[in-house]
Amino acid sequence: MLINPILETLDKFDIAILRELQADGRLTNAELSTRVGLSAAPCWRRVRALEEGGYIKGYRAEIDRHKIGLGVLAFVRL
């Protein structure tokens, strides 16, 4: 079985942090630390390290396209 070498550098807490932030990028550090089983300071340091390491590239909002008048999304290839 092949193992992704990148995953070998991430431990269970890093993966849990990534999973939680992917599900809800607006979590406070206090809520995130509770969900992953760390205290606040180590959780904050890990998030910063994941950002600096390029694992977390940014935080985004999911926009309701219909509410802002952009009902159709089309990909066109010529």
How should each PLM-predicted stretch be described?
Residues 1-78:
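A compositional/biophysical signature of low hydrophobicity enriched in polar/charged and small residues
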